[in-house]
Design a protein with these regions (language model features):
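Alpha-helix C-capping/helix-to-loop hinge sites
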Residues: 27-31, 78, 147
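Conserved AAA+/SF3 P-loop NTPase catalytic/coupling segment centered on the Walker-B
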Residues: 165-169
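N-terminal pre-P-loop "Q-motif" helix
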Residues: 75-91
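Interdomain "pre-motor" coupling segment immediately N-terminal to P-loop NTPase/helicase cores
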Residues: 14-69
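Conserved P-loop
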Residues: 86-163
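Intrinsically disordered, low-complexity and often Lys/Arg-enriched segments
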Residues: 1-8
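Short hinge/gating elements
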Residues: 24-28, 74, 103
Length: 169
């Protein structure tokens, strides 16, 4: 038998998989005094939604396998090849190419920002809800060769298809 209402609420929240909701007392303390029930419920649901979104973002970022985090705000656009405009890079960062089922291949000399841009676009894609898998070209080539030799190319293909974007920097 459960003793208190608080314990019952926490148990039900656990069963319903609403972990943030279980911290209702903290959320209620922060709410406006005299708020009606629908306002309180809305605050609880918004807190639960925000926590879930944050957890999903954290999982996507971890699964992407970025070696480090970089943003376009940190990028020195003077490194770019003169034929590539900063506006074009910002357009890529909108991630519209993913919805359009287009690929991006970045080729160039070392130190020109290909990896930085790939990671920055990948981070943006993760935060927009896309699954991303980051592989540099050398690692991807090695994995494909090893999978081919082990007759497991299908496994690699499924892994790549599962993700909305493959950034090879």
């Amino acid at each position: 038998m459960i003793d208190t209402k608080e314990e019952q609420i926490k148990l039900l929240c656990k069963q319903l998989k609403l972990p943030t909701f279980a911290n209702y007392a903290d959320i209620l303390r922060q709410s406006q005094p005299g708020a009606d029930f629908s306002d309180l419920l809305l605050e609880l649901l918004m807190a639960e939604t925000a926590a879930r979104q944050e957890n999903q973002n954290r999982r996507r970022l971890k699964a992407a396998g970025f070696p480090f985090q970089k943003t376009l705000d940190e990028f020195d656009f003077s490194q770019l090849n003169p034929g590539v405009s900063p506006v074009f890079i910002q357009e890529l960062a909108s991630c519209k190419f993913i919805d359009d089922r287009k690929n991006i291949v970045m080729i160039g000399n070392p130190g020109r920002g290909k990896t930085h841009i790939s990671i920055a676009i990948g981070l943006k894609a993760c935060l927009q809800g896309y699954r991303v898998l980051f592989k540099n070209a050398g690692t991807l080539a090695t994995e494909l060769t090893e999978a081919r030799d082990a007759y497991q190319l299908g496994r690699i293909e499924r892994q790549l298809k599962k993700n909305g974007s493959v950034n090879s920097g």
